[in-house]
């Protein structure tokens, strides 16, 4: 079940366990996080890319908490809804916002993930990737 794989990945991300995250993604994995006013982010690739992402998060945010409220399989993807609470290391910026993820699992590993500011945007992206279903 793809949702179980993604749920395990999210638990590892919440723990900031780079080795566990790297072990769960495919070699050609691509992760597209959101850029914020605290930091611009590009695409992170593969297991080493996710280790770098977690280091970048730690360098940017004094506190970074992800809460997951729902995980659902949709059109060959896994949608996740939740909330991010983060406090910048460099400024007084506090982010307390809803967040949604779209993930794709292939061959038992997570092959793609992208972060969105809303569930609607994540659903729309999944439908576009799936050919409009």
What do these predicted ranges mean?
Residues 1, 55-133:
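A beta-strand edge to alpha-helix "cap/lid" segment located at domain peripheries
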């Amino acid at each position: 079940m793809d949702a179980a794989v993604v749920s395990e990945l999210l638990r590892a991300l919440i723990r900031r366990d780079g080795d566990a995250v790297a072990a769960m993604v495919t070699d050609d994995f691509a992760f597209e996080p959101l850029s914020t006013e605290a930091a611009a982010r590009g695409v992170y690739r593969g297991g080493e890319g996710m280790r770098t992402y977690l280091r970048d998060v730690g360098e940017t945010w004094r506190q970074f908490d992800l809460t997951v409220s729902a995980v659902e399989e949709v059109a060959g993807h896994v949608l996740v809804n939740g909330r991010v609470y983060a406090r910048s290391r460099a400024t007084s910026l506090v982010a307390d916002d809803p967040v949604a993820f779209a993930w794709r699992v292939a061959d038992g590993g997570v092959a793609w993930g992208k972060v969105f500011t809303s569930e609607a945007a994540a659903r729309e992206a999944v439908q576009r990737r799936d050919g409009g279903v």
